[in-house]
Amino acid sequence: MEVQALTRYARMSPKKMRDISRIIQGRKAAEAADYLALIPRKSARLIAKTLRSAIANAENNNNLSADALTVKLALIENGPVLKRFKAGARGSAMPRRKKMAHIRIVLTDGNSN
């Protein structure tokens, strides 16, 4: 059975988050959570929070054991972009693009129900 958790509008560039999400894909959920706790990056904290939510969804909504769960998919999708301007040289304005990401984590217990 598959269980998922979704965090939308995370204020971080998707490119920075994808490095971490690739590492946890295919690992046991508990092992991935321990691994993310050791990485000193903001993206690791955001992904770990979503992973904990997915584990809680599996335990509370579907009565699955946390020990049997595996990270099937850790997907970082592009979110909307906030367009801002910063003062530039000679009175001009320089555009700044503040990117957002959507984090989707899918866990599976190995059974195809």
Swiss-Prot record:
Q: Output the Gene Ontology terms for molecular function.
A: rRNA binding; structural constituent of ribosome
Kindly name one Pfam family recorded for this protein: Ribosomal_L22
Q: Does the keyword RNA-binding apply?
A: yes
Question: Mind listing the UniProt keywords for this protein, alphabetically?
Answer: Ribonucleoprotein, Ribosomal protein, RNA-binding, rRNA-binding
A Gene Ontology cellular-component term: cytosolic large ribosomal subunit
Q: To which protein family does this belong? A: Belongs to the universal ribosomal protein uL22 family.
Q: Which NCBIfam families match?
A: rplV_bact
Keyword hit for Isomerase: no
Task: Output the SUPFAM superfamilies linked to this UniProt entry.
Answer: Ribosomal protein L22 (SSF54843)
Sorted alphabetically, which PANTHER family does this protein's record hold? CHLOROPLAST 50S RIBOSOMAL PROTEIN L22-RELATED (PTHR13501), LARGE RIBOSOMAL SUBUNIT PROTEIN UL22M (PTHR13501:SF8)
Gene Ontology biological process: translation
Taxonomic classification, please? Answer: Bacteria, Pseudomonadati, Verrucomicrobiota, Opitutia, Opitutales
Listed name of the protein: Large ribosomal subunit protein uL22
Name the HAMAP family for this protein: Ribosomal_uL22_B
Q: What gene does this protein come from?
A: rplV
Question: What's the source species for this entry?
Answer: Opitutus terrae (strain DSM 11246 / JCM 15787 / PB90-1)
Subunit structure, interactors included: Part of the 50S ribosomal subunit.
Q: What does this protein do?
A: This protein binds specifically to 23S rRNA; its binding is stimulated by other ribosomal proteins, e.g. L4, L17, and L20. It is important during the early stages of 50S assembly. It makes multiple contacts with different domains of the 23S rRNA in the assembled 50S subunit and ribosome.
